[in-house]
Amino acid sequence: MIKKIGVLTSGGDAPGMNAAIRGVVRAALTEGLEVMGIYDGYLGLYEDRMVQLDRYSVSDMINRGGTFLGSARFPEFRDENVRAVAIENLKKRGIDALVVIGGDGSYMGAKRLTEMGFPCIGLPGTIDNDIKGTDYTIGYFTALGTVVEAIDRLRDTSSSHQRISIVEVMGRYCGDLTLAAAIAGGCEFVVVPEVEFSRDDLVAEIKAGIAKGKKHAIVAITEHMCDVDELAHYIEKETGRETRATVLGHIQRGGSPVPYDRILASRMGSYAIELLLEGFGGRCVGIQNEQLVHHDIIDAIENMKRPFKGDWLDCAKKLY
């Protein structure tokens, strides 16, 4: 019988993490459970830095970006001895289960704790939208709005100077954020990691656009695919058009979460408590076709595949 739970946020922050913490805390308290907040993710868990949370601890948090519990990278958590200390800290505090909010690295930590016998529930909190078993992640829609706003602003200046602009978008090895932003921002070209990239093919497409009378263009590209400054130099050399690269960087992670992220985070946080009370552990929560779902966290990480939105790419190309 679960009486006390812990909650932490891990990895890169995402808008809506505070709303998810709030959802977990208030749903747990409504069911008569105690909640311990763990500072700075798995690092704080290892160092036994925790605080008891009540309803007022999460007041005025639903609209705040970031995570008030903090987050940290802690690669040492791969060590089984380190995880054993973490589990001992949880048991010492009387914590029966753990809710982890974060991306794929955070899920891996929850998976390893689960394999060591400690029940965990994972909530997908990342702007990258790269988590298996869910259509959307907490923070994705807010980041999408931020990226599209940046593209709109770049279009103003690009059109004024008849310039080609390259926009580097976060996403790690998933092109969802780039692709959605390219469609919503009316980008002329989009480059994502799911599709083989050739800079010469891109230049050929840009030249074809110029031949049709296009005066400026915006290229959206997912991070890690190439050096965007070098790409800009190459495009300018080959086309004769001034080309500049903009790396949006960590601004994409900040800001007050949009309503959908607040709703998604609240629903997922509450659902995590439902699952724990029903005796589930070692699960990850997702939303598919607007319905909350849960999957075995080990199976999700090791076996599930995340479909690429090929139809979205087809749409983007038709609208170039």
UniProtKB/Swiss-Prot annotation:
Residues reported in the UniProt entry to bind substrate: T126, I127, D128, R163, M170, G171, R172, E223, R244, H250, I251, Q252, R253
Keywords: Allosteric enzyme, ATP-binding, Cytoplasm, Glycolysis, Kinase, Magnesium, Metal-binding, Nucleotide-binding, Transferase
Activity regulation summary: Allosterically activated by ADP and other diphosphonucleosides, and allosterically inhibited by phosphoenolpyruvate.
Enzyme class name: transferase
GO MF terms held by the record: 6-phosphofructokinase activity; AMP binding; ATP binding; fructose-6-phosphate binding; identical protein binding; metal ion binding; monosaccharide binding
GO cellular component: 6-phosphofructokinase complex
PROSITE patterns, A to Z: PHOSPHOFRUCTOKINASE
Cofactor(s) needed for function: Mg(2+)
InterPro entries: ATP_PFK, ATP_PFK_prok-type, PFKA_ATP_prok, Phosphofructokinase_CS, Phosphofructokinase_dom, PKF_sf
Residues the record lists as binding ADP: 22-26, 55-60, 155, 186-188, 212, 214-216
Pfam families: PFK
Annotated function: Catalyzes the phosphorylation of D-fructose 6-phosphate to fructose 1,6-bisphosphate by ATP, the first committing step of glycolysis.
Protein name: ATP-dependent 6-phosphofructokinase
UniProt organism field: Citrobacter koseri (strain ATCC BAA-895 / CDC 4225-83 / SGSC4696)
